């Protein structure tokens, strides 16, 4: 059976704001199955935001596991991500899941990959999924050449990716965290 795939998730951190946004398209082969999926959500008492690219059912399984790790480690993002990655590498069922998570709190942004890797990106920018390269290029240009907010950069970059990538649409879900202490 063909795999559900294709999406674009973008995270930008600028100033005291971190934003993760994603499109709403779910594709099976060359057919759009759903146009308004919610691939970005808030976790752990609204202190963590996360988005996924990859198989939808796989991603929901990972969201549940990641949220359980956040609860276990009292919202400590890096510790929860590392523990999930350890499980991902050693659990026979998890190893078969095909998804990538982009997660962020007020202090850190991380990519958790299907290989069980935890990566902290350079330049406070994460772009995953089929439209990721388009969104990343747009976001980098906007970050370097404008004073737009993180939310505006995510919106504009995802719109550009949606105009280029056939697996990405412009039905966006955007979540943001503001750290007033910075």
Curated annotation (Swiss-Prot):
GO molecular function per UniProt: metal ion binding; threonine-type endopeptidase activity
Highest taxon in the source lineage: Bacteria
Compartment(s) where it occurs, according to its Swiss-Prot or TrEMBL record: Cytoplasm
Protein name: ATP-dependent protease subunit HslV
Record's subunit section: A double ring-shaped homohexamer of HslV is capped on each side by a ring-shaped HslU homohexamer. The assembly of the HslU/HslV complex is dependent on binding of ATP.
Catalytic residues as annotated in Swiss-Prot or TrEMBL: 7
Function of the molecule: Protease subunit of a proteasome-like degradation complex believed to be a general protein degrading machinery.
Catalytic activity, as annotated: ATP-dependent cleavage of peptide bonds with broad specificity
Activity regulation text: Allosterically activated by HslU binding.
Enzyme class at the top of the EC tree: hydrolase
Keywords, alphabetical: Allosteric enzyme, Cytoplasm, Hydrolase, Metal-binding, Protease, Sodium, Stress response, Threonine protease
Stated family: Belongs to the peptidase T1B family. HslV subfamily.
EC number: 3.4.25.2
Record-linked SUPFAM superfamilies: N-terminal nucleophile aminohydrolases (Ntn hydrolases)
Gene3D superfamilies xref list: Glutamine Phosphoribosylpyrophosphate, subunit 1, domain 1
Any one of the GO CC terms: proteasome core complex
InterPro entries recorded: ATP-dep_Prtase_HsIV_su, Ntn_hydrolases_N, Proteasome_sua/b, Proteasome_suB-type
Cross-referenced Pfam families: Proteasome
Binding, Na(+): 162, 165, 168
Species this chain originates from: Legionella pneumophila (strain Lens)
PANTHER family associated with the record: ATP-DEPENDENT PROTEASE SUBUNIT HSLV, METALLOPROTEASE TLDD
GO BP terms, alphabetized: proteolysis involved in protein catabolic process
């Amino acid at each position: 059976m063909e795999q559900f795939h294709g999406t674009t998730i973008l995270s930008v951190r600028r100033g005291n704001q971190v934003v993760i946004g994603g499109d709403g398209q779910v594709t099976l082969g060359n057919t759009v199955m759903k146009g308004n999926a919610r691939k970005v959500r808030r976790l752990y008492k609204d202190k963590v935001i996360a988005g996924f690219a990859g198989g939808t059912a796989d991603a929901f399984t990972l969201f549940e596991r990641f949220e359980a790790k956040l609860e276990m480690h009292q919202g400590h993002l890096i510790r929860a991500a590392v523990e999930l990655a350890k499980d991902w590498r050693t659990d026979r069922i998890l190893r078969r899941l095909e998804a990538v998570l982009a997660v962020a709190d007020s202090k850190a942004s991380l990519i958790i990959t299907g290989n069980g890797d935890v990566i902290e990106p350079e330049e406070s920018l994460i772009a995953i999924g089929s439209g990721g390269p388009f969104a990343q290029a747009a976001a980098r240009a906007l970050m370097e050449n404008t004073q737009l907010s993180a939310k505006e950069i995510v919106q504009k970059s995802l719109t550009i990716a949606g105009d280029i990538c056939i697996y990405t649409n412009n039905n966006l879900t955007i979540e943001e965290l503001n750290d007033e202490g910075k």
